[in-house]
Amino acid sequence: MARVTVEDCVDKVPNRFELVMLAAHRAREIASGSSLTIDRDNDKNPVVALREIAEETQSAESLRERMIESHQTQIEVDEPEEDQMALLMGSEVDRPVQDDMSEEKLLRALMEAQGQN
């Protein structure tokens, strides 16, 4: 029956290779739980997909669009962190300046600040 179904589909999708790709995609959709547009009649998913294409309950154009969408992927580009970005751009890293103040100098400065208040 599959051979007759393929021959029935050739007038809908003239390129047999494209027909196979579309029918395989539709068979995968059926296997993943998509609802059937025709009766199964004890046929396997690829035959049901071919019958749907032959009876035009699934248009070749909509199948083609869904197949293209299923093969598209979104690639995220990792941006470098701010510190790395500054170095890459040739500027210095934005960090607080470290003082060479010893503990004794810090205490003396605090005492002077408290004495002035």
UniProtKB/Swiss-Prot annotation:
Subunit structure: The RNAP catalytic core consists of 2 alpha, 1 beta, 1 beta' and 1 omega subunit. When a sigma factor is associated with the core the holoenzyme is formed, which can initiate transcription.
Superkingdom of origin: Bacteria
Keywords: DNA-directed RNA polymerase, Nucleotidyltransferase, Transcription, Transferase
Database matches in InterPro entries: DNA-dir_RNA_pol_omega, Pol_omega/Rpo6/RPB6, RPB6/omega-like_sf
Classification via PANTHER family: DNA-DIRECTED RNA POLYMERASE SUBUNIT OMEGA
The species this protein was found in: Cereibacter sphaeroides (strain ATCC 17023 / DSM 158 / JCM 6121 / CCUG 31486 / LMG 2827 / NBRC 12203 / NCIMB 8253 / ATH 2.4.1.)
Protein's name in the database: DNA-directed RNA polymerase subunit omega
GO molecular function terms noted in the UniProt entry: DNA binding; DNA-directed RNA polymerase activity
General function of this protein: Promotes RNA polymerase assembly. Latches the N- and C-terminal regions of the beta' subunit thereby facilitating its interaction with the beta and alpha subunits.
Family: Belongs to the RNA polymerase subunit omega family.
EC category name: transferase
